């Protein structure tokens, strides 16, 4: 029995050592993809969602007033989320450090790309807007030509646009929105892009155009 335990441990050790991030083999990619997903990334994503839920459950919306397009925390409210967002940042960094697989200039682990987007979103909720823009720019620059990263690149562009608007730089948001908005988008992305346009025009003081986009977003809103 002791022999089999030692043999199993030795085989497992050889497998783990063999699954290097420097080898572009299917088994290596799947090992690091699975490990990143179900360990660090999962925990970081859960921490982020817990933080968002905590804020949304405490936030009381006044339905007698015009509701905001987005239910985001202000700078003071964001401090309550710091511990959850910091955990998301920590776990995302762990994914990137331990599971990044770059070959011929392209990232092969989709959860590394997702980890960068989680970093951007966590920074956004912490009101660290410059760092949010840096993370979004990195995603666009490094993964913009990778098919498996199309989803994350879209959300990074949208988040960058929203961040610019919140910083009072609406002029910088328009090209990002224009670049994101296409008829080929999924229903969810199409709706979110319309909503972002409404936010852009509203914050720019162009109320008639904002109203048009709010109406369009209302028509494409998902039904529960």
Predicted stretch roles:
Residues 1-8:
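Bacterial N-terminal signal peptides that target proteins for export
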């Amino acid at each position: 029995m002791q022999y089999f335990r030692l043999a199993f441990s030795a085989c497992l050790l050889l497998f783990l050592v063999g699954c290097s991030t420097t080898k572009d083999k299917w088994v290596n990619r799947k090992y690091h993809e699975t490990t990143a997903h179900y360990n660090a990334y999962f925990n970081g994503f859960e921490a982020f969602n817990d933080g968002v839920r905590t804020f949304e459950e405490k936030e009381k919306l006044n339905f007698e007033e015009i509701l905001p397009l987005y239910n985001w925390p202000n700078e003071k409210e964001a401090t309550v989320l710091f511990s959850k967002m910091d955990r998301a940042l920590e776990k995302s960094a762990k994914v990137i450090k331990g599971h990044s697989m770059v070959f011929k200039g392209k990232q092969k682990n989709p959860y590394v790309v997702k980890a960068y987007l989680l970093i951007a979103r966590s920074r956004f909720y912490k009101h660290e807007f410059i760092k949010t823009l840096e993370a979004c720019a990195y995603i666009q620059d490094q993964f913009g030509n990778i098919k498996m990263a199309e989803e994350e690149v879209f959300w990074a562009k949208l988040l960058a646009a929203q961040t610019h608007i919140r910083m009072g730089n609406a002029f910088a948001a328009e090209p990002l929105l224009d670049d994101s908005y296409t008829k080929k988008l999924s229903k969810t992305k199409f709706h979110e892009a319309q909503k972002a346009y409404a936010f852009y025009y509203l914050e720019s003081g162009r109320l008639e155009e904002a109203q048009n986009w709010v109406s369009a977003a209302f028509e494409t809103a998902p039904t529960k």
